[in-house]
Structure formats: C-alpha cells, structure tokens
Amino acid sequence: MPLDGYRTEGFIAEGLFTSQDEIDNSPEQLLGTVVRPGDIKYRDINGDGRIDNDDKAIISPYGTSPRIQYGIGANLRWKNWDLGVFFNGSAKRTIIAGNITAFGTNDYNVMQFVADRAWRLDNPDPNAEYPRLGLTPADNANNMETSTYWMRNGNFIRFKTLELGYSFKYGRVYLNGDNLA
C-alpha cells in the first residue's frame, strides 16, 4: 500500500484509433461520448467486449507523494573563498498529465503547442502526443479519462542552490542563485 494510502487507478491506453474501421472492430467504449478517429483506445481488461469502469486497473502504485525524496549538498572553503551547492529531487513518482488544459480552458482556448502536437485528420499520426481535440468537454470525454496515455515520469533532480562568497576581516560578500536548473 502506498505511503499516502492512494494508488492511481485508470484505463490502460493502447494508443490512438486511426480509423473508423478500427473503432468498429474494437470493444465498444462506453465513456460518455461518441468515439472518433484520433481518440484514445483503451484495453478491455475483463474481456466483455466493452470499455467501462469495470476495465479500470491500478496504473501506478505511487500516490501523490514520491517514494524517495533526496538532497545532497557540499560546502567548500579555500582561503577567504567559499562555495556552496545543493541539489534535490524525487524518485519513484508518477504524475498524470491529463489536467494540463490540453483541451482548453472554460473558454476553450487551446495552447498552440498542444494543437501542433495533436492528432488531426490532415495529420493522422498514430503516435501523436495529444489525442484528437474536440469542441466541447462532452466531445473530449473519452480522452479526458485517467489512463496510462497521460502518465509521465515524475522523477527529477534539480540544481537548487549555488552560493559563492568571499570573506573579509569584518564581513562577507556573496552571490546566491536558487532553482538554477
């Protein structure tokens, strides 16, 4: 059981539908909208020929808290000079990127980088970074389900702090930077 008592449950994505023929020959997805080419295709876990809440599985054993959080630092001195560095990060963490407003805000504005990387009729890329974009939340319902399609690796390490200083007899001058990389 995860430390925070939470596991991520959702559908297992099998890519994007590339044609109406593929949709017609796949298990029926009963997720509140008409499925179209470019929509996310989900696995029929229980084999009943339809995709519904009974086909959800634990898609990440990690909850909202990373399993490992770490930091490492060093302070060096040489004559009147000093240098301090600190790195921190987390590991064993999965994030779900489905809520990054890929489908627009309440005004339905879509960021250009999303539109450029989405599945479109004029560019039917089966490996598109984003599924087909619809006009309304109801039109996007199939693609807004929590699934492995939206899972991302949440591990990171960052260069948190750098400080370089020089000490005088009665004081110290230093430069400090935070969140450098």
Where are these regions (language model features)?
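Extracytoplasmic gating/loop element in the C-terminal half of outer-membrane beta-barrel translocons
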Residues: 2-27, 33-37, 90-178
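Acidic carboxylate motifs that coordinate Ca2+ or other divalent cations, activating on Asp/Glu
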Residues: 44, 48, 52
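Active-site beta-strand/loop architecture of penicillin-binding DD-peptidases
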Residues: 55-57, 64-68
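Outer-membrane beta-barrel domain signature
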Residues: 59-63, 150-153
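Hydrophobic, lipid-facing positions within transmembrane beta-strands of outer-membrane proteins
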Residues: 68-74, 81, 159-164
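A generic beta-sheet turn/junction motif
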Residues: 76-80, 89, 168
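Repeated loop/turn-to-beta-strand initiation elements of outer-membrane beta-barrel proteins
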Residues: 80-84, 171-172
